[in-house]
Amino acid sequence: MLNTLVVFVGAGLGGALRHGVNLAAARLGGSFPAGTMIINIAGSLAMGLLTGWFAVRGGMPQAWRLFLTTGILGGFTTFSTFSLEAFLLMERGAFAAAALYVLGSVAAGIAGVGASLAVIRQFG
């Protein structure tokens, strides 16, 4: 129960942080999704730092790891988890699996959004 609570609180903080970055990026103007790009890159950098730190330091309580990675970074961006998983596949030499994971996730994600929008636009 404690782990679920710390993930819940962390996700709320990460989501609020994401909203703040998007608001700040919107002030730059333009139609390019700079906020999302900044969030995805920053989240991926943070995921690498935290994962590496946990591995080197060890002894970090599970609740803290969940709060920081699954909670805050999960609320901030799921792209950081996607990036970590793709990197770990490549690091293990599973290049075909990594390519399938990256290309499949992106292609299926875009197709899913497109199909859902088409249904709503047609029948919504």
UniProtKB/Swiss-Prot annotation:
Positions contributing to Na(+) binding: 74, 77
GO cellular component: plasma membrane
A GO molecular-function annotation: metal ion binding
Annotated TM spans: 5-25, 36-56, 70-90, 100-120
Domain of life: Bacteria
Gene Ontology biological process: cellular detoxification of fluoride
Membrane topology, from the record: Multi-pass membrane protein
Disulphide bond pairs: none
Matching HAMAP family: FluC
Role of this protein: Fluoride-specific ion channel. Important for reducing fluoride concentration in the cell, thus reducing its toxicity.
Protein family membership: Belongs to the fluoride channel Fluc/FEX (TC 1.A.43) family.
This protein's name: Fluoride-specific ion channel FluC
Native species: Methylobacterium nodulans (strain LMG 21967 / CNCM I-2342 / ORS 2060)
